[in-house]
């Protein structure tokens, strides 16, 4: 896959995938988007509910969400089993070109550890996070864990429609605990209806600064 490194509005890097005409993050700010949708609306909400939980990320991409999650949990005393799925991982060279640690002035060794860790083997990333990276498509995986939180960060429905089908959300729903949360940037009506049809309680929240007006958070009830 041919990826072009770009700079988003908040100064943080992302990639543009030419063959799909798709960006890995919002052009309005990679870090701003990830912090708002996945950390604030997802991780912090679940952290207030449970001190020990399992997290699934669909679409690890640049590992920005993994890194920001680890930074947010530092010193919290929480324990999180984090599974990150990615079908087309970055090369180490691509990862090392990303400016997230330089931009925030911290987390350099942590970011490198995420990308240098082996695939398919659990690693104790920090005191709080045990990380398992899996190189696979969501469709091919058997989800055996009971996840309390899902970061759904696939490419847009019009670019990767197979990951937004009702069958995919059913698979996720069945793998989640009661009260489990799913957060995503997409608020399209058809996606909301699919989530509701399966049994999720769906709410629209304010979107990230300068980016999309709204985001979605769904809870298994």
Regions from the language model: what does each represent?
Residues 148-162:
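A short SAM/SAH-binding and catalytic strip from SAM-dependent methyltransferases
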Residues 58:
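Conserved beta-strand/loop positions that form the S-adenosyl-L-methionine
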Residues 162-178:
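A short glycine-rich, Lys/Arg-flanked "PGG" loop and its adjoining helix->strand segment in the class I
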Residues 1-53, 70-100, 104:
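Rossmann-like AdoMet
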Residues 62-67:
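Glycine-rich SAM-binding Motif I of class I
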Residues 198-221:
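Core SAM-dependent methyltransferase catalytic element
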Residues 149-151, 178-186:
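Conserved beta-strand signature within the Rossmann-like core of class I S-adenosyl-L-methionine
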Residues 94-144:
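S-adenosyl-L-methionine
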């Amino acid at each position: 896959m041919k990826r072009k490194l770009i700079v988003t509005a908040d100064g943080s890097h992302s990639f543009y995938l030419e063959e799909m005409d798709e960006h890995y993050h919002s052009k309005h700010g990679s870090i701003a988007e990830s912090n708002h949708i996945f950390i604030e609306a997802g991780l912090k909400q679940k952290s207030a509910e449970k001190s020990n939980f399992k997290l699934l990320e669909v679409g690890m991409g640049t590992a920005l969400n993994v890194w920001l999650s680890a930074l947010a949990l530092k010193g919290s005393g929480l324990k999180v089993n984090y599974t990150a799925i990615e079908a087309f991982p970055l090369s180490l060279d691509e990862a090392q070109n990303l400016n997230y640690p330089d931009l925030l002035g911290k987390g350099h060794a942590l970011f490198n550890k995420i990308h240098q860790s082996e695939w398919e083997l659990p690693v104790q990333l920090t005191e709080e996070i045990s990380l398992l990276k899996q190189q696979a498509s969501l469709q091919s995986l058997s989800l055996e864990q009971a996840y309390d939180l899902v970061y759904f960060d696939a490419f847009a429905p019009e670019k990767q429609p197979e990951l937004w089908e009702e069958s995919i959300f059913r698979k996720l729903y069945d793998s989640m605990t009661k009260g489990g949360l799913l957060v995503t940037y997409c608020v399209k009506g058809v996606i909301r209806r699919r989530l509701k049809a399966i049994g999720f309680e769906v709410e629209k929240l304010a979107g990230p600064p300068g980016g999309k007006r709204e985001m979605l958070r769904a809870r298994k009830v």
